[in-house]
């Protein structure tokens, strides 16, 4: 058979690929718990994006299935073995700091800007077109492909729990998720959130009325705001000095004898907390110089003096390193304090390697004398597919052939749908020289990378199912 130029095949379909991708990116598919009902398990946005994706697949001649608006799939080909491709249509909150409307896709200087451009609507569409090329060329295959799209990957994966329970099909035999980076992700750390709990008593000469920071546990808080009152001498001048020293932005608004203090850092993916600047921990550090008392003081001291830049849990004594999987990472992701509440929290999203466990981490955190600790019900254990597995070898071979770069295994702190299968990995779509803007303002994907990824996906899928 004549060798197929997958890059040329993508070139023929570039405009169609972008048109379909734009139609997905224009949908605000953030989870919205305030609008959850029986028809919209995570709010209307994720459902709308799922329906649009399945509409595209219907148009292209696939038989689709929507599993109660939690997730959906279509299948291609025949065979006893099934290759699963797992993607998602939900996105993290857009947040602030964008130069463009996050839901008006914008191409500028060879980059496509929008929330979801790189995580995960762009890679999903590239992978979809990779399979579409195989279908349209009529290439011979011996295995079935099930392309599965979820709507709750960025939160608790309740979409996949429901999907597998109700779809009436066995899990695919092997597969990948186009939701990370090349050359491959064949290992993922465990993922759990642990919560520190504080009371709200607040009797110092300085008073903390509220403290709020962070949108999601798996995002570094870009900004945080506290409402304070009392003895706060030279508050403005001290803030000016503080933000200049730490290269931050900040502001104070006065209203009815209270001060609303905001500090702005930089958001990032919670699996890579060191690449962000946690506005909440810096705000706590700034406020801790004033004379707060009781649980309010404890809250600020923990956040500002222990959690600040403690990306591997050293200060909390939970640090752990595995030779193959690397170091534990920790993101202090969501901060909620209200003086009228008896339960004020800091959410710690922890990505842990083999050799430790959520229960062990919790027992160490319980040594903190000023806070109680609870463990989220939903988590993921560490996952690893050996380099010798034919799935890993095939994907790396295609990557090497198309890029000329040496493939190698990688373990990440991020969690992808690849871990849903025992023989599951993540594969693209970010390249080693790409700029990672996932979960950040001004998220983008370079168009050249998008099209390169589509060609790699086309050849990789074909090699796996031919």
Description of each model-found segment:
Residues 82-149, 155-156, 173, 441, ...:
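Active-site metal-coordination/substrate-binding segment of hydrolases
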Residues 186-212, 217-266, 270-330, 357-372:
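Acidic-enriched catalytic cores of C-N bond-cleaving enzymes acting on peptides and small amides
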Residues 54, 125-132, 161-164, 197, ...:
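Predominant activation on well-ordered alpha-helical scaffold segments within soluble catalytic domains
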